[in-house]
Regions:
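Catalytic cysteine-centered active loop of the rhodanese-like fold, especially the PTP/DSP P-loop
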Residues: 105-153, 157-159
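Active-site neighborhoods of enzymes that stabilize oxyanions during catalysis
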Residues: 163-170
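Flexible, polar/low-complexity N-terminal or interdomain linker segments that lie immediately upstream
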Residues: 6-71, 75-83, 170
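N-terminal secretory signal peptides that target proteins for export/translocation
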Residues: 1-4
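Second-shell loop/turn segments in exported
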Residues: 43-50, 94-100, 125-129
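Mid-length scaffold segments of soluble, non-membrane domains
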Residues: 74-105, 121
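Sec/Tat-exported extracytoplasmic proteins
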Residues: 63-67, 78, 93, 114, ...
Length: 170
């Protein structure tokens, strides 16, 4: 007959195995397909857009180094930019869906915001990785001839989650 401690140990081990298996299945259950879809879509946007990417940590480092750059928030003013944005960012809203053509007025306003120096470091972001606004902004900066364009895919969500400071419009 098995000792009580041996039975309890076996029950504990079986519970642990079932728990780990269940947790693994819960993490695996279809979520990776969503992650893959986001990653593939992002990679294709970067390829089509012709821009580079920058991580949250890299952007924070550039800001801390006081690197000369223009940071553009492409989110709506009232719903997002006014409430929180990366320090020093200026706002220029782009739609979520890819924009094949900009009207002349929007194109001129965006080019004016970006300035005459086509070699200037420009970082463009939106709310989060799946948001297409930053893709549109970065893609159009490249189409307008700017050569040092970065998309910050994590956007304000990643910035805030990293506990980095944000600015608000008063």
């Amino acid at each position: 007959m098995l000792k009580r401690s041996t039975v309890l140990m076996w029950l504990f081990c079986m519970g642990l195995i079932v728990g780990l298996a269940t947790n693994g299945l819960a993490q695996w259950g279809g979520k990776e397909v969503d992650t893959e879809k986001t990653a593939v879509n992002f990679a294709k946007e970067v390829e089509r857009g012709g821009y580079k990417i920058v991580s949250t940590e890299e952007l924070k480092g550039w800001i801390d180094q006081k690197k000369d750059m223009l940071i553009v928030d492409t989110m709506p003013y009232e719903d997002s930019y006014k409430k929180q944005h990366v320090p020093g960012a200026v706002q220029f809203e782009f739609p979520k869906e890819e924009v094949a053509k900009l009207d002349d007025k929007t194109k001129a306003a965006f080019e004016k915001l970006l300035g005459p120096n086509k070699d200037r470091l420009i970082v463009i972001y939106c709310g989060f990785t799946k948001c297409g606004r930053s893709h549109n902004g970065a893609m159009w900066a490249v189409k307008l001839g700017y050569k040092n364009v970065y998309r910050y895919p994590g956007g304000i969500k990643a910035w805030a989650e990293a506990d980095y400071p944000v600015e608000k419009v008063k």
